[in-house]
Amino acid sequence: MASAPDYGKYSEVLAKKMDPVVLAEIRALEANNDVANPRYMELLIPNFYNQHLMRLPEWPEPVNRMFKHLNGEIYTMMQGPSEFGISGRLSKWDRKADLPQLTLPVLTIGAGNDTMDPKHMEWMSTRVRKGTYLHCPEGSHMAMWDDQKVYMEGVISWIKNLDGK
């Protein structure tokens, strides 16, 4: 998304879809600055990540490897400690007004279950001069894995059509 504040607002839309009991426990951990508590990830993985980050029953090895090497300190510094809103250094980051300055072909990709608002991703494609939007209806944030056919066919088609842009 081109706006961290908009991303934060959309995370609240996703939060409202969660089991209220689970969300309340997540919010309590966040309110107590206890996101390092293993219980936080025990709640996030099945109730948020498995719904909006990666929708496969078993995550591919490269995804697991990425999480193993994720720099949590930097992630938290940029995003903030919560998956529901942005309070880190990117909290006010917003580049929506700059999108029309992009003159190269741009492919924005949204997914039906993404952590990023697919409507915002589609909107972005209309703001750049040579934008195309690809929607992966069954995908999540990692649609390249969990809606692979739509994702790969869409990216390949977009690349093949670049000469026309």
Report each predicted region and the residues it spans:
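Active-site nucleophile loop of the alpha/beta-hydrolase fold
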Residues: 1-7
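Flexible, glycine-rich phosphate/dinucleotide-binding loops
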Residues: 4, 115, 142
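Short, solvent-exposed loop/turn and secondary-structure capping segments
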Residues: 7-10, 119-121
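Glycine-rich, phosphate-binding/catalytic loops in enzymes
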Residues: 11-17, 123-127
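Non-transmembrane alpha-helical segments in soluble domains
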Residues: 45-49, 125, 152, 156, ...
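Conserved loop-alpha-helix segment in the C-terminal half of the alpha/beta-hydrolase fold
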Residues: 96-139
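Catalytic active-site module of serine/aspartate enzymes centered on a nucleophile-bearing elbow/loop
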Residues: 130-165
